Amino acid sequence: MNKVSVGGVELLAVENQQTLVAYLLNNGVLLTGKLIAINAEKIMIYQEDNEMKRLLEEAEYKYADGISVVCTIRSKYPKYSKIERIAGADLWERLMAELGECCLPVFLVGSSEDTLQATAMKLQEWQVKVVGTQNGYFAKEQEEEIIQRIKASGAKFISVAMGSPKQEKFMQKAQQLYPDALYMGVGGTYDVFVGKVKRAPKCWQNLGLEWLFRILHQPTRWKRQLRLMKYAYFYLTKRL
């Protein structure tokens, strides 16, 4: 698949969610590697943090989650003017539904134990084959043991809800020890999936204002959004 570059980060030039899902499922043979959502904040961290830069460069599949990234691609690459934002939470749900139909085993990592179990139960109602779970509260010394559990489970898809950059670091290590699976970083997706966190209404999502909805409902996130201002400056000065 073709790629585009935004701020030095290479992303899949995929037009919409349906196309990306079909690409990852590869006619029933799930691709292996790391799947990471890219937004403006992550691109700015890529510019500032050498470790994050390395993690993102080594991730096989990166897609445009943030509307600002989508706007940059449309402006920078006229041939991709129809590219759409692919929300990570929506992509994950679609993949879960498809994996359930294909009977491919799934392992869930991250979040609190109660949210994790609620997620697993709901997925099982969707006929998803959940072969293991691990909450996000574990020490670095336990990582190898957890990864061996994942490997022993035979999981082909591992979703990791630990927030960035913890989930990227974990996926990197897990892939080194167990490369025969697709790893996806999903942040707070489990909380949204089971109804613990309210997601922006569809009209906000369609307008590309989901980030603003999050700030209004979680004011502690405002500092993270300062990077959006920096991104906007880079965009206006054509440094992306």
PLM region spans:
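A transmembrane-helix-recognition feature enriched in membrane-embedded lipid enzymes
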Residues: V70-C71, R199-L240
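Proline-aspartate-enriched helix->loop->beta-strand connector
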Residues: I150, G154-S159, S164
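Conserved acidic residues
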Residues: E60, V106, V131, K156, ...
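Conserved beta-alpha
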Residues: V70-R149, S153
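Short, flexible loop segments at boundaries between secondary-structure elements
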Residues: N135-E141, P179-H217
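Short glycine-rich anion-binding loops that position phosphate/pyrophosphate groups of nucleotides
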Residues: A40-I43, M162-Q167, T189
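N-terminal nucleotide/polyanion-binding subdomain common to many enzyme families
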Residues: M1-I86
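Short Gly/Thr/Asp-enriched flexible loops that form oxyanion-binding sites at enzyme active sites
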Residues: A120, E168-L177
